[in-house]
Amino acid sequence: MKYDYLVVGAGLFGAAFAQMAKEKGKRVLVIDKRSHIAGNIYTEDVGGIAVHRYGAHIFHTDDEEVWQYANRFATFNRFTNAPLAKYQDRLYHMPFNMNTFYAMWGVTKPNEAREIIERQRKEITGEPKNLEEQAISLVGRDIYEALVRGYSEKQWGRPCRELPAFIIRRLPVRFTYDNNYFNDRYQGIPDAGYTAMVEKMLDGIEVRLNVDFLQHRAELTKIADKIVYTGPIDQYYDQCFGALNYRSLRFETRDLPVQDYQGNAVINDTNADVPYTRVIEHKHFAYGQADVLNLPHTVVTYEYPADWKQGDEPYYPVNDAKNGALYEQYRQKAAGERNVIFGGRLGQYRYLDMDDTLRAAIDCARKELQ
């Protein structure tokens, strides 16, 4: 059978493109080298708890069309992301707000917190030369040392003084007692998990798992008129310009015989001597679902940053000048392709929130299918 589109990758971008193509009457085949669909938003039921296998994913957006599109395939709960950060056995609210400032300095009034931050920001004069100077110029020395430095150095595997300033464009600071991490109008998590959502997106579409496109490229390229490729763009071109760099992650998941382990969905650990960056307790994502919250067990995941090497799962692009220039070479080469569309975080070598991924997929499909 000849397909109109071969979609490489059953993650959010690939699933959305495939769904829209099928809706337009196109013949679509979706393949994925993993044994499951949904990519990194894959959720798996463990004793009644939807476990986010590749780290916490909270859907949030201000994009009305994207929100309505997502709601075609899932009913979202009202989960509000309010993470905590642990530093030297004390807990601080994220993002930085009046609860954070009270815990750190004992201040209760917004103007008191502003005065401290403004005074500490003045330590940096001129254009920040690295991540450390950038962070201090935004939030001051105290917050940087307690809540930014250790976490960032673990996440990127390098001292903050060696990291480029542009990694942190901004650090959200609120002078209210609002613990909601996101400012977006819409926020939540699918009641049935992300895997069920992607299953509905792919309903009626042929899906083949455990198929590595790069290993079977010769035969696969013959069965479709066009390819939508969501894998690493450098690997598509056999790394002809060199390998793009990534950061990887390692997850250690435990099923514990207690009803509640930490009382919150996500607690970051900013201590430099603690190897993991955060602990996720998955049942707390099930907002309003008493049957889940009251289960006599819980599932927690420790998230460890890791250096990436060939063969490892790539998670975050390393957005420095070297990799940016290298990606630009691949982007220009890809621009000359007539029958290949590159999309998603790996195909575009950029970090994408879920709503950004859906927006990119919707726009791409709309342009392609018009």
Describe each region flagged by the PLM:
Residues 1-13, 29:
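Beta1/beta-strand and adjacent pyrophosphate-binding region of the FAD-binding site
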Residues 3, 25, 205, 223-225, ...:
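Short, well-ordered alpha-helix to beta-strand connector turns
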Residues 12-13, 35-37, 99, 153, ...:
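Short, solvent-exposed loop/turn segments at secondary-structure junctions
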Residues 17, 22-47:
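Glycine-rich FAD pyrophosphate-binding loop
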Residues 24, 214-333:
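Mid-domain catalytic core of redox enzymes
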Residues 39-52, 59-113, 171-176:
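A conserved beta-strand/loop capping segment in the N-terminal third of enzymes
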Residues 85-226, 230, 237:
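Active-site/ligand-binding neighborhood in enzyme catalytic cores
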Residues 313-370:
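C-terminal catalytic lobe of FAD-dependent flavoproteins
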